[in-house]
Regions:
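Cysteine-centered motifs
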Residues: 3-4
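Conserved catalytic or regulatory cores that recognize and/or transform ribose-phosphate-containing ligands
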Residues: 15-147, 152-361
Length: 361
């Protein structure tokens, strides 16, 4: 039931022209609330779907050279400390369009410091859900641990491309990694690329580091793997999918879409819209995790205008295809784009904070 000032309740038999007539007579701030209620109350959550899927590439494996991710493509040949770093260098120069979609866990280095993420595994599941492919080069203790976790998680294993160094098999003695996760993935027809490359291990100050044995064979290997990855990733890309409220990445994209439609939202507004209007349970802690992730992925940004507002970036084109409940209250052409443009005009006229946050004042 939607209420208007001095108008009582809007009856279920009122048609859209009646709403527009009422909008002209009530205050603008109330009009914003009315349009918000009409939009959210008529969404049929079970029938919405995902569009414009970002198709990120979540790339895991050995360490990279230094901490500055922007300098990956400037590393000197022969100075790589992991195969992952060498392949990233290759993609940045030979597959530039694909490289733009690469996600590195290092980009989220402050996840623990700011207590944005409950635990690393759940966070990686979220990132993997947003990706079209998860590339894991099995090199180093961290990558071995990720292989064990990723191989048994359906959300990740279906997208997993594993690159495995057979040089880890010494004198025919296979390890747990070989008999366990690798065999499990191959048995379930997942992509496992078996290669071999030399690694030089160094012990310094009680810490083990590694360098790649860079030679012509390794250079040819990097070119081969880069070509293989480009082909395999292209085969996994898709633009649409069914929405599920049980899938963290789908919920994350729903949050991004609400920010896109409403153009400027506070945290509590997002939580209210999802919990109370869409009837989806979402804890504030998890919502903050989604907002943190979306910000680091460049899909939203923050702006303080008295309160903190979350705004869409140019990369955020909306991710939800809405379906609305059948109702005589709505016109056939009612859409999220109509709501977005109408709300923007309302903000300019009578919402100083949002207009300022959006650079409209």
């Amino acid at each position: 039931v939607i209420c208007c000032r001095n108008r009582g309740h809007l009856g279920k038999d009122l048609k859209w022209p009646h709403y527009e007539a009422i909008f002209k007579r009530v205050g603008l701030m109330e009009t914003i609330n009315q349009l918000t209620s009409i939009f959210l109350n008529h969404i049929e959550v079970e029938k919405i779907s995902l569009r414009n899927l970002p198709n990120y590439i979540f790339f895991c494996g050995g360490g990279i050279n230094g901490d500055d991710l922007s300098k990956i493509n400037t590393s000197e040949l022969g100075e790589f400390n992991s195969l992952r770093c060498a392949i990233l260098h290759y993609l940045s120069s030979q597959e530039k369009e694909l490289y733009q979609d690469v996600i590195l866990a290092e980009k989220f280095h402050d996840w623990l410091d700011d207590a944005n993420i409950n635990n690393l595994i759940d966070f990686e599941v979220l990132l993997a859900g947003l990706a079209t492919a998860v590339i894991l080069i099995v090199e180093g203790p961290g990558a071995h641990a990720e292989l064990g976790a990723f191989s048994v998680m359906p959300q990740i294993s279906s997208k997993l491309i594993t690159i495995y160094n057979v040089n880890s098999i010494k004198n025919g003695q296979r390890t747990f990694i070989e008999w366990g996760p690798i065999k499990f993935l191959e048995k379930n027809e997942k992509i496992v690329l078996r290669h071999e490359w030399g690694v030089i291990y160094q012990l310094e100050d009680n810490a083990i580091s590694q360098l790649i044995d860079y030679n012509d064979d390794f250079k040819a290997l990097v070119n081969l793997i880069g070509t293989q990855l480009a082909k395999d990733i292209q085969g996994k890309s898709k633009k649409t999918a069914v929405f599920s409220r049980e899938t963290p990445s789908d919920m994350c994209l729903l949050v991004a879409d609400l920010v896109y439609v409403f153009s400027a939202l506070k945290l509590r507004e997002i939580k209210t819209y999802i919990n109370e209007y869409l009837k989806i349970d979402l804890e504030e802690k998890i919502l903050k995790e989604y907002l943190y992730s979306l910000k680091n992925l460049g899909l939203i940004k923050e702006k303080n205008a008295g309160a903190k507002y979350f705004l869409p970036t140019e990369k955020n084109k909306g991710f939800i295809k809405y379906q609305f409940k059948s109702s005589p209250d709505l016109p056939n052409n009612f859409s999220a784009n109509y709501v977005k443009s109408t709300l923007l005009s309302f903000y300019i006229k009578d919402d100083n904070e949002r207009a300022y946050a959006l650079g409209l004042r």
